[in-house]
Amino acid sequence: MTIKSLSFLAALSLFALTLPLVIASDPSPLQDFCVGVNTPADGVFVNGKFCKDPRIVFADDFFFSSLNRPGNTNNAVGSNVTTVNVNNLGGLNTLGISLVRIDYAPNGQNPPHTHPRATEILVVQQGTLLVGFISSNQDGNRLFAKTLNVGDVFVFPEGLIHFQFNLGGTPAVAIAALSSQNAGVITIANTIFGSKPDVDPNVLARAFQMDVNAVRNLQARF
């Protein structure tokens, strides 16, 4: 076998070994449960959290209340997201799922954002919502939008920019599940115009084809 062939086989083997790492999401658990704790005492570090000693795990480690309480929507965007993830429900650790309640004021919105680690499935509990997501550059940045009423369900694919807007004159409520114990969130406007420190306004002016002073005004808002 030639040196060239050996080099090709070595590169192919390396690619095969790294491919599972590239496509992986939350790893599957190798135990019944791993209740997340923030201290290492009597714990094992798994998936970003220390596991609570199974001998002192109780039902409350898998319990969260208060999703029946409306969130405060008195803010600039007119919405509030109440999150149930591994940070406030330790029993979710390694289970690859989390939940949110979203409250919308009349004409409020959950502004364009993305979850870098999760797909989201949403069901409307109250009101009427305009929802949608935008596909990637490779797909031509197509908008997929739908008006949802009570009981309707919509899916937002992992990593894609999406939004919800309350079309009604009364408050709206939705519940959403995400395919990660900690999905993460990147709100587009806050990230671009509210970064710390600011992105050079000349960069954003060129990217958005805007006047530099208009960019500075937007940055001042965030």
UniProtKB/Swiss-Prot annotation:
InterPro entries: Cupin_1 (IPR006045), Germin (IPR001929), Germin_Mn-BS (IPR019780), RmlC-like_jellyroll (IPR014710), RmlC_Cupin_sf (IPR011051). Residues 65-216 form the Cupin type-1 domain. One of its GO terms (cellular component) is plant-type vacuole. It holds the Pfam family Cupin_1. SMART domains: Cupin_1. Glycans are attached at N80. It is found in: Secreted, Extracellular space, Apoplast. Keywords: Apoplast, Disulfide bond, Glycoprotein, Manganese, Metal-binding, Secreted, Signal. Disulfide bonds join C34-C51. It comes from the Eukaryota. Residues 1-24 form the signal peptide. Mn(2+) binds at H113, H115, E120, H162. GO terms for molecular function: manganese ion binding. PANTHER family: GERMIN-LIKE PROTEIN SUBFAMILY 3 MEMBER 3 (PTHR31238). Oligomer (believed to be a pentamer but probably hexamer). May play a role in plant defense. Probably has no oxalate oxidase activity even if the active site is conserved. Belongs to the germin family. This is Germin-like protein subfamily 1 member 8. It comes from Arabidopsis thaliana (Mouse-ear cress).
